[in-house]
Amino acid sequence: MAKLFAISDIHGYLDEFLCALSKVDLSDKNNRLILIGDYIDNGLQSFQVISKIIELEELYSNQIITLLGNHEEWFYDWLILEKPTSSAFPETIKSFFSLEELDYILKSNPNNFETAVRDEIKNNIKFIPFINWLKKRYKDKRYYETDTQIFVHAGIDEEAGKLWKDLTSSEMFTNKFPITTGDWWIF
């Protein structure tokens, strides 16, 4: 019988992610791993976590389902859309570079470190797989559905009932607030 594994809110903690992955069995081609967002921020290895996810997607392309969370959306808005942010993702940014590289970037543009680091991520060849992954995932739907389950980072519009797919705002899928728990819907 196929198994579904789900992991959420890794937040840049690679060791903990690897520990959780050690309990996931993808040797059975029918098993699935659903990653439910917030892979970055807080921990010191956000870039390494995403790199591991990209590797898993390549190795198990039909078994890995990857959904974005609000932290990836915020990072996309900052990096790709160049929207201003209040946090500038310090731990996530540090995970892309060595201390020497960060020092060089700071010295190259001391008046606007945020722009300099954004440009370095966007223009450095070693980050192309990450950029492509982020752009592709940003276009993907924010939920995964089985016959009996809905996987989503934050929530759905519970009042919409069977019309939740059509009536849930994209914001609610990844950033639902306040947190609520509702009935279990079986369609």
Locations of regions flagged by a protein language model:
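Feature recognizes metal-dependent phosphohydrolase scaffolds
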Residues: 1-187
